[in-house]
Amino acid sequence: MSDDGHLPPKSSVKRWLVTTNHKDIGILYTATAIFTLVLAGIFGLLIRVQMWESGAFILSDIGYNQVVSAHGLLMVFWFLSPFAFGVANYFVPLQIGADDLAFPRVNALSYWLYFFSIIIFAVSFFQEATFSGGWTMYAPLNVPTVDASSVASVGGFAAVLALVVFTASVTLGSVNFLTTIYRMRAKGLRSRDMPLFSISILLTVWMMLFAFAALLAALLVLSSEHLLATEYFASEEAGGGLLWTHLWWFFGHPEVYIVFFPALGVIAEIVQTFSGRRLVGRKWFIIAMALVAIQSFIVWMHHMFLTSINLPIKTVMMVTTIGISLPFDLMVFALIYTMIKGRIRWKTPFLFALGAILIFIVGGITGVFLGAIVLDYSFRGTYWVTAHFHYAMASAAVGIIGGIYYWYPKMTGKMYNEFLGKVHFVSAFIGFNLLYFPMFVAWETPRRWFHYDAGFTIWHQMATVGAFLFAASFLVMFYNLFMSLYSDRVVDDSPWAYTESTEWTVSSPPPEGNFPGTPSFASGRLEFLGADGGEAQTDGGMADATDAVEQHADHASWWPFMIGFSALWTMIGISGLPTSYSVWPILFALPVFVGALGIIGARRDGFGPIHGLYLGAAMPLLSAFLLVFHAHHGIVSGFVEASNYFYITLFGAVFGAVSFVGYGYESFSVPEPDFAEQWPFKDVKNTKLGMWVFLASDIVLFGALIGAYGFMRINYGWTDWWADASVHMAVWPGLLNTYILLASSFTVVLAMAYARRGSRRGTLGFLGLTFAGASIFLMNKGYEWYEHYIHQGWVFNTDPMASTYYLTTGLHAAHVVVGMLLVLFIIARASKGAYWSEGESADTIEYYGLYWHFVDIVWLFLFPLFYIL
């Protein structure tokens, strides 16, 4: 990174470590996803070799389970969606007329969390044994109290933690895309007028925001079973196994559409371009997509027809499942009719789009069988499901591959080899169908098992041949795209005869700042406006990033990489921590965070009394934690006997604490767009909208945990549950904490009010009171936990009530700690004139207040649940 914060050249490795430019991040996502595809594909080939004949062939029983699990997890999580969002990162800002995503550093952080989550998963293979519980991770088969084999090994837990990091990446990306699309569209570009790919991404990130929050809740509970020995999924009397299935499939079925929707948008763009006409029934196509996005959250129980759910509920889910196919019928017919009405150009992108439609039709039709209760009883757990699932999911991959060919000229300025592109399509299409269609014939083969009836051998051998042909087809693609980079087939702005979207109006590849001026559709056609509001002089799309709005597209930051790197070490360490050491690395990192606020803050703003206070407080705080550690483990013996995983976690947590402070203090300006289409959030700034969206995800997270509490209590017996726990629960600690948090919400409001009045004393005073209130809350909660855990012996796994109490209130306490760390940062900045002095804005305190009010509101639900009802 140069001294002025600009990016190094693309030939430099450093460029790709520090970039925040959306096009660079898109390339990183795409390249990493392709690497994951290769890795998962190798696992897939191992599966097919094992299935060449019935019985053990090249893999042991546990080895086969590990390969099947890794293949599924890598494909579903680390390939399909990131592959699509590599394309989305690159082209959504270009399509909507934005110079970048709303939060460029958050975009980079999202990528690095994704990247390092893959590394965590890869490392799990070298930690005793990796996860082997299947990609659906069904509990209670994967919790230590039930299965102490490789499913519950250190490596198995590391795979779970890798998914936690991946989910964090997805959440950040969802917040970023929603804020960008709602706040940074070109003037005059209404939401419904956006290109269909961008509309599909908008609907996808809404689904991701809520679905992945439910998955995160499930993963946090599963992690607590490994790390803290809680008793959720292992509890038979509280219906723990069924609870996992609900949480998983509430995420899992929307995930099918999360994967397919970006491909659907790509397919629509390609069909329009190569049919030479606008999509027939475009309005209804968009409405149908929106209906599917909504309906996706009310069909999850069709995956649970074999469970003990009563028949009326199953019947309702059968109806909703069949009903969700109707909007897809409309969309498929719209695509087909567009092709009929247009004049088709049989180029490689169109072939892949057409292939994706055909594959999806097969996947959709065969899925209807599984939506019928009676048929599901026969097909569930067989290779019919395997074939259906791959037809549904692979249609997304095939569609996005078509998008790679479609936009390759725009990204590189070079045209791919058309002949090799068609060779790739033909070999891939034949190989795919040869691989998966025989599975419908051999449908009685049980899933996740390599023993089968000898009569199915020919079909499995046919599938194995198809697998190798399908894999070989990608070698053609890789060769074609790589060699085309060095060809002389240079393209202009648009190599296609019919294109409507904005990305085709700039040079290939696009410049750093994307556009030669500010894009606007206000006149009814695309114009690039200069700083004076007049039409800009275009020069093929080249423009220097000279004004404030364009500068951040060329900005660099090390901190997203650093935070992702810290997550790598922290999660690898946590995977091997015993329960007795689980909390200490995080506690020891807190004084480091406070000390870093003093040191980095002094360098950034100049040394002041507040920085001295933070530096002075860090050592006593660390000493206090060491004294408590000594009481539990012994100050010498505790560190001597600690495993390597303890020190790995400690390194990651400390490195992360410093990285977060550096991220917060970095001078990185992203100006608010002042000439954009922003309905319905015109008067809501980017950061405020981003906070709202993030809190919407957090609502689902806590809602899932509260729902888990209710589900388990109803199954356990509502009154029996409280009878077992009432001897441990006193009302007054919870009531006191309720008053404390409500008062702290009031002090945040007063701090914001005084900041807007320009009062330094009032701002700092009420921010300090907010911190004090949070501290008292935690001390009271800590005392309460100490009484329960040490004096009463009511530990994490005493009963289901104890597990739900400690985990749910513990997650809330973690939110309180985050709020305290944030307010310490705000106090440090405010002490040097930020937020309240002339020319400063109090908006940061307002945004912090939104978060803090949410934390308080959550407690208003937890208090009656755990102390009164």
What does each model-found stretch correspond to?
Residues 2-726, 783, 787-789, 794-797, ...:
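Membrane-embedded and interfacial regions of multi-pass energy-transducing membrane proteins
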Residues 75, 802-821:
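Short alpha-helical packing/oligomerization segments
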Residues 246, 686-692, 735-738, 746-754, ...:
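Polytopic transmembrane helical bundles with strong interfacial aromatic enrichment
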Residues 348, 758-764, 797, 801:
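Membrane-helix interface segments
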Residues 691, 695, 734, 805-809, ...:
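Short alpha-helical catalytic segment bearing the HExxH-like zincin motif
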Residues 731:
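An acidic/histidine-cluster motif and surrounding catalytic segment
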Residues 758-765, 823, 827-857:
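Interfacial loop-to-transmembrane junctions
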Residues 860-869:
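Juxtamembrane boundary at the C-terminal end of a transmembrane helix
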